[in-house]
Amino acid sequence: MQEHYQPAAIEPAAQKKWDDARISNVSEDASKPKYYCLSMFPYPSGKLHMGHVRNYTIGDVLSRFKLLNGFNVMQPMGWDAFGMPAENAAMKNNVAPAAWTYDNIEYMKTQLKSLGFAIDWEREVATCKPEYYRWEQWLFTKLFEKGIVYRKNGTVNWDPVDQTVLANEQVIDGRGWRSGALIEKREIPMYYFKITDYAEELLNDLDKLEHWPEQVKTMQRNWIGKSRGMTVRFAVSDDSKQGLEGDYAKFLQVYTTRPDTLMGATYVAVAAEHPLATAAAADKPELQAFIAECKAGSVAEADMATMEKKGVPTGRYVVNPLNGDKLEVWIANYVLWGYGDGAVMAVPAHDERDFEFAAKYNLPKKQVIAVGDNAFDANRWQEWYGDKENGVLVNSGDLDGLDFQTAFDAVAAKLQSQGAGEPKTQYRLRDWGISRQRYWGCPIPIVHCEKCGDVPVPADQLPVVLPENVVPDGMGSPLAKMPEFYETSCPCCGGAAKRETDTMDTFMESSWYFFRYMSPKFSDGMVSAESAKYWGAVDQYIGGIEHAILHLLYARFFTKLMRDEGLVNVDEPFERLLTQGMVVCETYYRENDKGGKDWINPADVELTFDDKGRPVSAVLKADGLPVVISGTEKMSKSKNNGVDPQELINAYGADTARLFMMFAAPPEQSLEWSDSGVEGAHRFLRRLWRTVYEYLKQGGAVKAFAGNQDGLSKELKDLRHKLHSTTAKVSDDYGRRQQFNTAIAAVMELLNQYDKTDTGSEQGRAVAQEVLEAAVRLLWPIVPHICETLWSELNGAKLWEAGWPTVDEAALVKSEIEVMVQVNGKLRGKITVAADASKADLEAAALANEGAVKFMEGKPAKKIIVVPGRLVNIVV
């Protein structure tokens, strides 16, 4: 055995050993319990970052722990390869997105392998490959035929200069991120998934997810947003019907969760796209201008919530069905046409947004809810105005005095009898628009025929292959400029037709990839029935909290779609979810001439610390001049505070990187980067190596202790007690608690006790062998390379075949225990007694204790309190 720890030598050797033995390559094996562990797959951006390292190390720790416990473990990896960053890089570097993506995949795969992750690379998928997205297209066509996928007009952000649709995050202050042009809202045909058909099941099945963080489930519940309310129809006033047709000429329909406040409505507001707004604006330039302004704004709901609320009156009126009041119709920029009916009833006295709007435009506020003796002030919003739990109706005629539920039912009865409304359950969740006017995505498998309409591409003509030799220029859709792509014949009539040139939202690929891993080379469907039956759901899923809503919701939705197609036999995709925290690091900057900030990498900064180790000042190493310490933030390119994992691996080895990531913080909390923490992790591994080296140097490996420990010294019994209590704790930390930092700390404590114990005797060496063999197995999930190497020196066998250390229950039973002795509640000494000592024996031993005798000062004991196994308190 080498005297010194040399990760650069042992890590490639250990990895070759695992690869040769194919320990990560699995197939269905009914003789073993299965364990499917999955970390969210990465976007192939070019390099791994520390967030990736943390995410995949957590997954690998759990996978290796289960492997040693006899499970058939699948831990696959792939690439979420479509998306905008590849198009942006392509434009910047004048290279096809495909070439850029495949180069990045190869480099990142090399990085992942260097970290020693037990990944089954034979299951690798890349979502940009036709053999993957073929089956996504196939499912799309099946769902289109069923009506679960449909086409309708949707509102998008349109860049008139680049002639392209922009995502909400690409619109900055109302302008295109690349062109700087003022953005317009446009209506274009788009494809939608009817996720709303599954809203109730998606909501109810959250209750089945016992091993998901409550925070994630709450976020999904809020996103689905089930509410019980009423549809209310306000009759259009006779003098306001001009320009309106059909039902729009008869009534204005709204949805409200507060029908009890209907008597307090003082105006109604409609979206700029509402037919009533269009009709009112026909001869009013000021309305036309406001509608144009609204249409130029963002279509993001989050932006709607924070932007300034604006409106204009239309001069049109509707009639309140309860009291006959005429209410003016306003066009408001906060009402979304794509949500509900594109109209809301406004009750300024009891809704904060309506209150602010009414105050701005001097509209009336009518109180119809009272809470106790609180006085209503029309000039100031108070929280109780919106209280439906404790309020009763006032100023509402025969409804006065009713509470919320009673008033709800009474209003429902009145409106239903008039045909002016009915109760309705509504969801905040909207159907999922998956059309993207981009190049680097999965082609939508639809052919447009003038005679036959929208025709799905038949299964035997799939996949519709995306041309990979395209370099986008950012001007419009490349596919729409390629006749060789879009010119085709109709599958129904054989006539000339045109392919759809939109591509799919990249959330599509990540909504089912976990099923494709089960049979990645299966050529007859999305997943083989045999594989789907064996692997079932993912047992453990790991990823960031930022994916709590969209990705996880769409993955749950797709699972139900695939179940209903008979492809899988589970209702939910992920049994257990771990959302790891971010990796954060200090940030430093200098202000530049333009008033901005030039961010400086922490490696280029030298710090001065106070006597408590806190940084008080910083200078740039290059010039010695000050820089501003800006606090810790998530590692990012924009703040230039990232640490390259490759540099860490090159300097310290993969095991040090893995150990630091698991020891620095519990997995669900943010991890603060620390150079000293990395050095500390490396020191521990050197110490572990040296401990085994020194043990073997004194006489080589022996047979580990097993059997009856009655003949052992107390010191060796205590060491075995520590060993087996540590094994029990670490097993629980890995398996149930998933707290890897405390598992590492427990093994460190075990090695501390080992160092203090005399193991020079024959029995001592056998116990030492037992301790060291167990320690390297307990740490193998976290630092597998060093442990694999040390195991081969200690045992000569293959660690992955050794199994998890078992707990010797006899070793956990201590023949003697240490008990604290107190006098008047203050600790004065300790006594060692038999574990089964009686109360009388404990009292006698405590009274004889030297510290107790001293502090009793010759006084008799008035009372002796015994807490078995813990303490004796003598009261004098």
Swiss-Prot record:
Give a Gene Ontology cellular component term annotated to this protein: cytosol
* UniProt EC number: 6.1.1.4
Reaction(s) catalysed (UniProt annotation): tRNA(Leu) + L-leucine + ATP = L-leucyl-tRNA(Leu) + AMP + diphosphate
Compartment(s) where it occurs, according to its Swiss-Prot or TrEMBL record: Cytoplasm
Motif 'KMSKS' region — list its residue ranges. Answer: 634-638
Against CDD domains, the record matches this protein to: Anticodon_Ia_Leu_BEm, LeuRS_core
'HIGH' region (motif): residue ranges: 42-52
* Primary localisation category: cytoplasm
Query: Which cysteines are disulphide-bonded?
Result: none
Q: GO terms for molecular function, please? A: aminoacyl-tRNA deacylase activity; ATP binding; leucine-tRNA ligase activity
Q: Pfam families attached here?
A: Anticodon_1, tRNA-synt_1, tRNA-synt_1_2, tRNA-synt_1g
Is Transcription given among the entry's keywords? no
Q: Where does ATP bind?
A: K637
User: What are the UniProt keywords, alphabetically?
Assistant: Aminoacyl-tRNA synthetase, ATP-binding, Cytoplasm, Ligase, Nucleotide-binding, Protein biosynthesis
A Gene Ontology annotation in the biological process aspect, one of them, is:
leucyl-tRNA aminoacylation
Q: Which InterPro entries is this protein grouped with?
A: aa-tRNA-synth_I_CS, aa-tRNA-synth_Ia, Leu-tRNA-ligase, Leu_tRNA-synth_edit, M/V/L/I-tRNA-synth_anticd-bd, Methionyl/Leucyl_tRNA_Synth, Rossmann-like_a/b/a_fold, tRNAsynth_Ia_anticodon-bd
The family this protein is said to belong to: Belongs to the class-I aminoacyl-tRNA synthetase family.
Name of the protein: Leucine--tRNA ligase
